[in-house]
């Protein structure tokens, strides 16, 4: 039995979907422990591409149980739409293999309206690039202890009272500050209950389900969303998400003790990308950046937005290692670098006249660093057909080993293409 946490080591979009899908074969239960539908996993199975926003990608494997933990914020409308889409493609979506924690907080219609109104109201320089899906406002209500939880769907009177109480404040903001029309409590209640009727059969005690699985000797895979440097506490604040994305939250967001987590795999893309606003020291606003974007198909699975691209930032990776304590690294999209004559790695920053090995902690400090690069030979070889470590060209192996040396963490998986079988185990 092995319990594995998979988390992103950069700004999200590291290729977690493929690695989770690969590791699912070796797991019995897959748990999503934070975030909402602001993140998307793209999984390629044969000729079929699946994009999952809420439901763990383990659902694509027969016989696997998928759980959505208390650390997630769930949009009932999106959840129901995702269920219908997967079911139409022949995937078993029965409550016996997909469960939602009763403690999971729900994204309400007014959360989405507030998220979009607030971002539109900000001046250009203050925008943080939110997806506008209500994630932040939902986490706000959770922290303020006025949120709606999944279990409330089975208690209509409690749900209605929570909606009415929330709209007293939300409507004051809509009409008084943002110039929006007020929302009607009855309309919101009816909309939520319409989706809630489909959602209630999936409610369960997720913590208990995980502990029962362990008692039976089964393995659990904890699937993180987004990336370390979008973490609400440890990311490039304020250009971050609203939840903790680091590995430690796998326990809190699922209802299990951290001592049960055996292995932590950090997913690292072979170059760096970022969606939306925020500092990005190694960003390439040139032909090389365009090359990476086009060859790597760097467009958001959730928003379709172009991802900003740049060289691998080892300063960011060192911080990720310090925060997450990974046992090993899965290196993804190495094949995208094929065709580049030279490849650079940022090994340090210059900040306030000094060379530093870790990101500055002041707000927007990373917007004022200068990357220090080392350059390595590139390669022209197409490596997508390589199936063993020995078959990789020498410059490719040198690049992988250099990343391993800088981070101090073994790279156990090397992805050389989007398919499941285009992965080399070391």
Curated annotation (Swiss-Prot):
One cellular component term from this protein's GO annotations in UniProt: cytoplasm
List of residues binding GTP: 12-18, 40-42, 307, 333-335, 415-417
Localization: Cytoplasm
Binding locations of Mg(2+): 13, 40
Keyword terms of this UniProt record: Cytoplasm, GTP-binding, Ligase, Magnesium, Metal-binding, Nucleotide-binding, Purine biosynthesis
Catalytic activity: IMP + L-aspartate + GTP = N(6)-(1,2-dicarboxyethyl)-AMP + GDP + phosphate + 2 H(+)
Pathway(s) of this molecule: Purine metabolism; AMP biosynthesis via de novo pathway; AMP from IMP: step 1/2
Cofactor remark from the record: Binds 1 Mg(2+) ion per subunit.
Major subcellular location class: cytoplasm
Molecular function via GO: adenylosuccinate synthase activity; GTP binding; magnesium ion binding
Quaternary structure, from the entry: Homodimer.
Biological processes, Gene Ontology terms: 'de novo' AMP biosynthetic process; IMP metabolic process
Protein known as: Adenylosuccinate synthetase
EC number: 6.3.4.4
Function: Plays an important role in the de novo pathway of purine nucleotide biosynthesis. Catalyzes the first committed step in the biosynthesis of AMP from IMP.
Class in the EC hierarchy, top level: ligase
Positions of IMP binding: 13-16, 38-41, 131, 145, 226, 241, 305
Residues binding substrate: 301-307
Disulfide bonds: none
UniProt cofactor(s): Mg(2+)
Record CDD domains: AdSS
Similarity comment text for this entry: Belongs to the adenylosuccinate synthetase family.
């Amino acid at each position: 039995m092995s319990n594995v946490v998979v988390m992103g080591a950069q700004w999200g979009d590291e290729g977690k979907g493929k690695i989770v899908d690969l590791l699912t074969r070796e797991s019995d239960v897959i748990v999503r422990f934070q975030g909402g539908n602001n993140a998307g996993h793209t999984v390629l199975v044969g000729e079929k591409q699946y994009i999952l926003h809420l439901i763990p990608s383990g659902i694509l494997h027969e016989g696997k149980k998928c759980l959505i933990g208390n650390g997630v914020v769930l949009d009932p409308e999106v959840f129901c739409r995702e269920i219908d889409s997967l079911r139409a493609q022949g995937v078993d979506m029965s409550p016996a293999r997909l469960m939602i924690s009763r403690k999971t907080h729900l994204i309400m219609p007014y959360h989405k309206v507030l998220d979009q109104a607030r971002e539109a109201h900000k001046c250009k320089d203050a925008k943080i690039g939110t997806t506008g899906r209500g994630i932040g406002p939902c986490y706000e209500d959770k922290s303020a202890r006025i949120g709606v939880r999944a279990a409330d769907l089975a208690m209509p009177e409690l749900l209605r009272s929570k909606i009415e109480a929330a709209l007293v404040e939300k409507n004051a903001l809509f009409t008084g500050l943002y110039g929006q029309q007020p929302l009607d409590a009855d309309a919101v209640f009816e909309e939520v209950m319409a989706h809630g009727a489909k959602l209630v059969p999936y409610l369960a005690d997720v913590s208990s389900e995980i502990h029962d699985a362990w008692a039976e000797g089964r393995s659990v895979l904890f699937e993180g969303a987004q990336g370390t440097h979008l973490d609400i506490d440890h990311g490039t604040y304020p250009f971050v998400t609203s939840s903790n994305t680091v590995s430690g939250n796998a326990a809190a967001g699922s209802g299990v003790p951290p001592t049960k987590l055996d292995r932590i795999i950090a997913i690292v893309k072979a170059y760096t990308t970022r969606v939306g606003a925020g500092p990005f020291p190694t960003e390439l606003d040139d032909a090389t950046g365009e090359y990476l974007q086009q060859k790597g198909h760097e467009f958001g699975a959730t928003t379709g937005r172009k991802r900003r691209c740049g060289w691998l930032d080892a300063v960011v990776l060192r911080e990720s290692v310090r925060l997450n304590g990974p046992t090993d690294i899965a290196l993804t999209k190495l094949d995208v670098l094929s065709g580049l004559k030279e490849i650079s790695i940022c090994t340090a920053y210059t900040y306030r006249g000094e060379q530093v090995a870790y990101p500055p902690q002041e707000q927007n400090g990373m917007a004022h660093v200068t990357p220090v690069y080392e350059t390595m030979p590139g390669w022209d070889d197409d490596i997508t057909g390589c199936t063993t470590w020995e078959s990789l060209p020498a410059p490719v192996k040198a690049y992988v080993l250099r990343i391993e040396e800088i981070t101090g963490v073994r790279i156990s998986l090397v992805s050389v293409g989007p398919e499941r079988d285009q992965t080399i185990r070391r």
